[in-house]
């Protein structure tokens, strides 16, 4: 007999699913399956089909019980959510009725010391969501001081990024920086803790995690893919947890929610009509009750929009000119 799956309560889950307004017979995508909280909620609302995507193999394995419980209405695919258009096509769903994305690291990943995401748990400095590609330890060992400083400043918004990078380079001359505790100790000597503020290593760990997993590039590509696969009237709901992610989502909806030329970064983009109607003029945030139950919800923001009948924007979702994982690892 299969064990009953753990009931995971997703951040802003009720609000996100309400934005999707699932209907019987609809096809929905949980683009960041994780512990399956959004998928479970969508399946419970109506007789829907859900395609769950996650690049973390352990998340997919953990979702098999929900697949069985759903009676075949849930399909799980191990892949990056930037590939959601190809995943949907492979599953026979050229268009879908709704997509939910919960961006960033999951609580499950943070709680596993051997995944190397948390400065609070000692473990190998890994941080990979998929288990493939360079680890955070590889980046720390091989990136130049300038690249490290740029990574930490851009993706972590750490004001002392240059000092942190300098300290990392000095430390690695003596011994490899191979564990989360070793890195946290290095950063804590440079970024001093202040009462009632975040841990000194928070921003550096965030930066390396985002960089190793190319999270912002993934988000940009996933949003563009969602625009292509949503049917008119289909809805996209995105939950983000820090300002970099939220800014990307906000700008995407703002750009797609108007006509005319593109942004100053992409002036060549022209739209005869908006491809999205924005449902959340201001982001939805968690209430005090949810924050008390789950402190991670404090920083969460939900934005949602409804697909119009206008053609998808001729935009490939190119990223801004921030540091590239491939270039940094080859010394470029």
Swiss-Prot record:
Stretch list, region Disordered: 284-332
Reaction equations catalysed: cytidine(1402) in 16S rRNA + S-adenosyl-L-methionine = N(4)-methylcytidine(1402) in 16S rRNA + S-adenosyl-L-homocysteine + H(+)
Localization annotation: Cytoplasm
Keyword entries, A-Z: Cytoplasm, Methyltransferase, rRNA processing, S-adenosyl-L-methionine, Transferase
GO aspect biological process, one term: rRNA base methylation
UniProt: S-adenosyl-L-methionine binding residues: 36-38, 54, 81, 102, 109
This protein's record includes keyword Cytoplasm: yes
Molecular function via GO: rRNA (cytosine-N4-)-methyltransferase activity
GO CC aspect terms: cytoplasm
One Pfam assignment: Methyltransf_5
EC number: 2.1.1.199
Function: Specifically methylates the N4 position of cytidine in position 1402 (C1402) of 16S rRNA.
UniProt similarity note: Belongs to the methyltransferase superfamily. RsmH family.
Protein's name according to its UniProt entry: Ribosomal RNA small subunit methyltransferase H
């Amino acid at each position: 007999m299969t064990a009953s799956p753990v009931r995971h309560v997703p951040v802003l889950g009720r609000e996100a699913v309400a934005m999707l307004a699932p209907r019987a017979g609809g096809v929905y995508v949980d683009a960041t399956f994780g512990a399956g909280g959004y998928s479970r909620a969508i399946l419970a609302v109506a007789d829907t089909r859900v395609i769950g995507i996650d690049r973390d193999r352990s998340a997919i394995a953990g979702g098999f019980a929900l697949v069985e419980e759903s009676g075949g209405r849930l399909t799980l695919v191990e892949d990056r959510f930037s590939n959601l258009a190809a995943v949907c096509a492979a599953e026979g769903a050229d268009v879908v009725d709704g997509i939910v994305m919960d961006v960033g690291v999951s609580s499950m990943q943070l709680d596993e010391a051997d995944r190397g995401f948390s400065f609070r748990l000692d473990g190998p400095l890994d941080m990979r969501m998929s288990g493939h590609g360079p680890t955070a330890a590889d980046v720390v060992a091989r990136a130049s001081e300038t690249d490290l400083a740029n990574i930490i400043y851009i993706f972590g918004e750490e004001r002392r990024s240059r000092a942190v990078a300098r300290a990392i380079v000095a430390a690695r001359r003596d011994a490899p920086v191979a564990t989360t505790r070793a890195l946290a100790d290095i950063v804590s000597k440079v970024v001093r803790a202040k009462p009632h503020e975040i841990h000194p290593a928070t921003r550096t760990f965030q930066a390396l995690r985002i960089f190793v997993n190319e999270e912002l590039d993934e988000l940009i590509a996933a949003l563009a893919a969602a625009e292509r696969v949503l049917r008119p009237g289909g809805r996209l709901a995105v939950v983000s947890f820090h300002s970099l992610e939220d800014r990307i989502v906000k700008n995407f909806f703002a750009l797609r929610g108007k006509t005319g030329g593109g942004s100053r970064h992409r002036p060549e983009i022209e739209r005869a009509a908006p491809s999205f109607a924005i449902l959340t003029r201001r982001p939805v945030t968690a209430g005090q009750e949810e924050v008390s139950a789950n402190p991670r919800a404090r920083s969460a923001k939900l934005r949602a929009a409804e697909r119009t009948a206008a053609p998808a924007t001729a935009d490939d979702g190119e990223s801004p000119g921030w540091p590239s994982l491939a270039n940094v690892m080859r010394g470029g």
